[in-house]
A protein has these predicted regions:
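CBM-like carbohydrate-recognition segments
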Residues: 93-103, 119-129, 135-226
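Extended ligand-binding clefts on enzyme/binding-domain cores
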Residues: 1-41, 45-131, 139
Length: 226
């Protein structure tokens, strides 16, 4: 409900709020994509607890319409890979639109046999973005590409099973490959690897979290006016 209090009139959720509660002036595509997924998950959990929250699903529907029909509603962040694949990974874009979205950004963000660049103007490949992009392709039905992307994260794997956050592959062959941030292996990177492997393999009941629509038991209930 705190998140929904940060909606603009068009239904987009602003990115942040100052300590004095002054809202920022813009919404992010990546953030709103994550929020629409969280709202649907929250509504499904609320159903299980016997406390239906149909207004959460209604708010997610509004976000879906914005994401699929009016990308101009969001602050431009085309440099970042997350803005490319998050609408697909989180289920806002599906079907032909999802496939087209992923195809459109592939050449801008993907280094073949390396992975997904965090930003499109640097040679910095991150295991988390590569894994999340694999989930997005899995959600769009391109499981073979998803597997390939996940395999590309193997150079990030340490002997202890953790994963280096990022690797910079220099454009000039004579330059040295470096890890960036230096020698960082992060929990969020490991989490992204686990989620991608599960989505691709179907290894747990949670494997469809990003690849199938979130089903509500009380979907027939009407939301209050927003």
């Amino acid at each position: 409900n705190w998140v929904l209090d940060m909606r603009r009139e068009d239904g987009a959720v602003i990115w942040a709020r100052e300590v004095d509660s002054q809202p920022w002036g813009y919404a992010l595509l990546t953030g709103c994509s994550s929020i629409r997924h969280a709202l649907r998950c929250g509504a499904a959990l609320a159903d299980l607890l016997g406390d239906p929250q149909p207004e959460w699903t209604s708010a997610a529907d509004v976000l879906d319409r914005l994401i699929t029909t009016n990308l101009e509603a969001f602050e431009p962040k085309e440099r970042w890979a997350m803005d490319w694949y998050y609408p697909v990974m989180t289920g806002a874009m599906t079907g032909a639109q999802a496939k087209a979205r992923l195809a459109e950004g592939w050449d801008r963000f993907v280094l073949d046999d390396r992975g997904v660049r965090c930003v499109n103007d640097e040679q910095w490949v991150t295991a988390a973005e590569t894994s999340e992009c694999a989930i997005a392709h899995c959600a769009a039905g391109d499981r073979d590409i998803a597997r390939e992307l996940l395999l590309w994260t193997m150079p990030h794997r340490r002997e202890d099973g953790a994963y280096w956050t990022g690797i910079v592959y220099p454009a000039e062959p004579e330059k040295t490959i470096v890890r960036f941030p230096a020698d960082e292996y992060s929990a969020y990177t490991a989490a992204a690897i686990i989620l991608a492997a599960d989505a691709i393999s179907g290894g747990s009941p949670a494997s469809t979290l990003f690849t199938q629509p979130i089903v509500r038991k009380n979907a027939h209930l009407k939301a209050r006016a927003l």
